[in-house]
From Swiss-Prot:
PANTHER family: ANTITERMINATION NUSB DOMAIN-CONTAINING PROTEIN, N UTILIZATION SUBSTANCE PROTEIN B-RELATED
Keywords noted in UniProt: RNA-binding, Transcription, Transcription antitermination, Transcription regulation
Superkingdom as given in the UniProt entry: Bacteria
Name listed for the protein in its UniProt record: Transcription antitermination protein NusB
Family the UniProt entry places it in: Belongs to the NusB family.
Gene this chain is encoded by: nusB
GO cellular component annotations of the record: cytosol
Native organism: Clostridium perfringens (strain SM101 / Type A)
Length: 135
């Protein structure tokens, strides 16, 4: 199973949930029905639990993220960056099989690929504060 690729799909689906009114389960089921996407090497349990966990803990995740923002409000963060922050914050809080520092590094890699260069240091700074507050 490819966790990096699975995390990329989790990002895409978390973003989809953010811009639509779909629930996590609807989003995941729609993804599973898409025959154009090869799912052979994906960690589907990771993707599904991530979506459900983000949905279930959205208020807690957003509150924790917002508490680490300096001169920013949550609604000013791009939906892609917010999705990245939610995934990593969820992993830091709840994913026992993903070390916090690994989650932050993976979030930075997602940011490099799906956002802009200015966002990399922003994402890193917020997640570093989240991690230090939790540990």
């Amino acid at each position: 199973m490819n966790r990096v690729k699975s995390r990329e799909y989790l990002l895409q689906l978390a973003y989809q949930m953010e811009i639509t009114s779909e629930t996590a389960l609807e989003t995941f089921n729609s993804f599973m029905e898409n025959e154009d996407i090869s799912k052979d090497d994906l960690d589907l349990a990771y993707i599904k639990s991530g979506l459900l966990g983000i949905e279930e803990n959205k208020e807690k995740l957003d509150s924790l993220i917002e508490s680490q923002l300096v001169k920013w409000k949550l609604n000013r963060i791009s939906k892609v960056n917010l999705s990245i922050l939610r995934i990593s914050t969820y992993e830091i809080l709840f994913a026992e099989d993903v070390p916090g520092k690994v989650s932050i590094n993976e979030a930075i890699e997602l940011c490099k690929k799906y956002s802009d260069n200015k966002s990399v240091s922003f994402i890193n700074g917020v997640l570093d504060k989240v991690y230090k507050n939790i540990k």
